């Protein structure tokens, strides 16, 4: 397993450390597992070669990775993640499956690998990218002609319930700005065609405190780069406002599924 140290001085590096510390990620990340299952189901009918070359960005502990290796057992897989501890767990969780695989610590927003690949795929990682259009451009350049870039990321309606609480108390939302369907549709690189599908996943918590605790348990609590923490007193009032409901505090994950096919090779000839 290749373990270069990349991106530790920036926000992506802090995100990687958060996920690396999330010891219970594989057991607690139920939404991430559900989204990986859904993305894998959407890939079933995609016509890949019998022995495809596949790159996964942000493999985590291997939710999607297992689907990929089962779907294309003759493939060659490169599994990457910004967190070395996550990669170690992914390697362990795939140990019972036959097939060719490599593991590499890498910031998926700034790929340090060479293509071409038949499939570049990512589930619930791209929401951490600072420049999503630029990342899509870079990842699409790794595709073979007729290769696919497929991913699941978060959309603009994610945690809209918590956003409402923040607005009610004059507190900044503190989460990155996620794209809506139309905005993501405008990000597709030239040289191919893409489509976007969406889903809304409600997740019930006992309270706002339970919601924030769940984010910490899976390492997904890193705020946006410009966020300033609110006072403890204000946070207590905000959390109190989420208590007392008959069904606790439900938040929505707005998931965008993107599928881009490279229709021709516009890379320069060397």
UniProtKB/Swiss-Prot annotation:
Pfam short name (any one): Methyltransf_12
Gene Ontology biological process terms from the UniProt entry: biotin biosynthetic process; methylation
Keywords: Biotin biosynthesis, Methyltransferase, S-adenosyl-L-methionine, Transferase
EC id: 2.1.1.197
Keyword Ribosomal protein in annotation: no
Major enzyme class: transferase
Cystine pairs: none
GO function terms (MF aspect): carboxyl-O-methyltransferase activity; malonyl-CoA methyltransferase activity
InterPro entries reported for this sequence: BioC, Malonyl-ACP_OMT, Methyltransf_12, SAM-dependent_MTases_sf
Catalytic activity: malonyl-[ACP] + S-adenosyl-L-methionine = malonyl-[ACP] methyl ester + S-adenosyl-L-homocysteine
Pathway(s) where this gene product acts: Cofactor biosynthesis; biotin biosynthesis
Family: Belongs to the methyltransferase superfamily.
Cited HAMAP family: BioC
Biological role stated in the UniProt entry: Converts the free carboxyl group of a malonyl-thioester to its methyl ester by transfer of a methyl group from S-adenosyl-L-methionine (SAM). It allows to synthesize pimeloyl-ACP via the fatty acid synthetic pathway.
Name by which UniProt lists this protein: Malonyl-[acyl-carrier protein] O-methyltransferase
Organism in which the protein naturally occurs: Magnetococcus marinus (strain ATCC BAA-1437 / JCM 17883 / MC-1)
Lineage of origin: Bacteria, Pseudomonadati, Pseudomonadota, Alphaproteobacteria, Magnetococcales
């Amino acid at each position: 397993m290749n373990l270069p140290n990349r991106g530790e001085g920036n926000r992506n590096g802090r995100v990687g450390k958060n996920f690396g510390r999330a010891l219970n990620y594989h057991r607690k990340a139920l939404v991430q597992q559900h989204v990986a299952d859904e993305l894998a189901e959407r890939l079933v009918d995609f016509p890949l070669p019998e022995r495809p070359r596949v790159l996964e960005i942000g493999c985590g502990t291997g939710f999607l990775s297992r689907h990929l290796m089962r779907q294309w057992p003759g493939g060659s897989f490169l599994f990457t993640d910004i967190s070395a501890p996550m990669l170690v767990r992914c390697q362990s969780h795939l140990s019972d499956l036959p097939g060719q695989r490599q593991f590499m610590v890498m910031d998926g927003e700034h790929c340090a690998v060479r293509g071409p690949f038949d499939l570049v795929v990512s589930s619930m990682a791209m929401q951490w990218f600072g420049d999503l259009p630029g990342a899509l451009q870079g990842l699409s350049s790794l595709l073979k002609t007729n290769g696919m870039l497929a991913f699941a990321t978060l959309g603009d309606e994610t945690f809209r319930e918590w956003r409402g609480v923040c607005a009610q108390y004059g507190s900044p939302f503190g989460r990155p700005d996620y794209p809506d369907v139309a905005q993501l549709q405008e990000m597709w690189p030239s040289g191919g065609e893409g489509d976007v599908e969406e889903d809304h996943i409600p997740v019930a918590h006992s309270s706002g405190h339970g919601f924030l605790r769940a984010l910490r348990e899976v390492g997904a609590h890193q705020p946006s780069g410009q966020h300033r923490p609110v006072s403890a007193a204000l946070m207590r009032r905000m959390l109190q406002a989420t208590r007392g409901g008959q069904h606790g505090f439900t938040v929505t994950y707005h998931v965008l599924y993107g599928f881009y096919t490279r229709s021709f090779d516009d890379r320069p000839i060397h």
